[in-house]
């Protein structure tokens, strides 16, 4: 545990050092730059805004962590995020329910969109033994172009001066309190659920042991193929 923490800390420090080196080469002051970075993002007034903006990154990071801990090298999070956002946007444009129903409905649509896109790579692996390392990367590009096409043509806001969709129904907007968006609460809830499943449930144990030693897992009666697909969908 201590070693993992140390590795992460060293990795972050190296990233800052490399960033500082690039800035020095380009003639910028890295200390001033990093000061402004932290001042803007971590000042008391800006922390709620920073947390709100971090939600998509944290959720996709959790998705990747489940896959990596269980074996699959799923690099398709950017494409899955786009497809989930696109499906949720379509739902928000054509469905209007009370907020208590609309928000969960759109969240479910977003999860389904991402799961279906990841499921394509999972099925290609299951049926044709195609590496998810390659297919998820390729699907990222397809999702990128498909989303770009959808925003520019069928979903384009006619009065807009640049590519964008119309606003979704207001009943689907996450509540906000100042700079704090309630999506942060959803993110924290998702973190607790995923942590519990991966570390405290039978399914999570099977996923982790499958990633560490698939032969041992198979001999122990673990359904490798089923778990692979489930993990990819998550």
List each model region and its residues.
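Alpha-helical transmembrane segments and their helix-start/interface "positive-inside/aromatic belt" motifs
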Residues: 1-13, 127-139, 225-226
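Interfacial loop-to-helix junctions that mark the boundaries of transmembrane helices
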Residues: 2-7, 39-52, 76, 101-105, ...
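N-terminal signal-anchor transmembrane alpha helix
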Residues: 3-25, 29
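Residue-level recognition of pore/gate-forming positions within transmembrane alpha-helices
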Residues: 12, 57, 81, 85-89, ...
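Single transmembrane alpha-helix segments in multi-pass membrane proteins
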Residues: 22-26, 32, 36-95, 111-130
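Hydrophobic/aromatic residues within transmembrane alpha-helices
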Residues: 29, 142, 216-217
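Transmembrane helix-bundle core of multi-pass membrane transporters
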Residues: 132-200, 227
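Membrane-helix/interface signature in polytopic inner-membrane proteins
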Residues: 193-231
């Amino acid at each position: 545990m201590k070693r993992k923490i140390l590795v992460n800390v060293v990795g972050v420090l190296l990233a800052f050092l490399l960033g500082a080196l690039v800035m020095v080469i380009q003639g910028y002051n890295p200390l001033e730059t990093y000061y402004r970075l932290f001042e803007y993002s971590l000042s008391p007034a800006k922390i709620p805004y920073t947390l709100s903006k971090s939600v998509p990154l944290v959720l996709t990071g959790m998705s990747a962590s489940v896959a990596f801990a269980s074996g699959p090298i799923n690099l398709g999070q950017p494409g899955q995020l786009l497809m989930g956002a696109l499906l949720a946007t379509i739902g928000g444009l054509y469905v209007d329910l009370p907020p208590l129903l609309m928000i969960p409905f759109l969240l479910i649509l977003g999860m389904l969109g991402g799961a279906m896109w990841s499921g394509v790579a999972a099925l290609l692996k299951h049926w044709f033994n195609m590496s998810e390392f390659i297919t998820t990367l390729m699907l990222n590009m397809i999702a990128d172009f498909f989303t770009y096409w959808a925003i520019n043509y069928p979903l384009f806001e006619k009065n807009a001066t640049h590519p964008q969709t119309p606003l979704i129904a207001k009943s689907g907007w996450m509540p906000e309190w100042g700079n704090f968006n309630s999506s942060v609460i959803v993110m924290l809830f998702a973190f607790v659920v995923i942590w519990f499943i991966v570390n405290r449930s039978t399914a999570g144990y099977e996923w982790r042991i499958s990633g560490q030693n698939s032969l041992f897992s198979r001999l122990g009666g673990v359904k490798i193929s089923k778990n692979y697909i489930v993990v990819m969908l998550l």
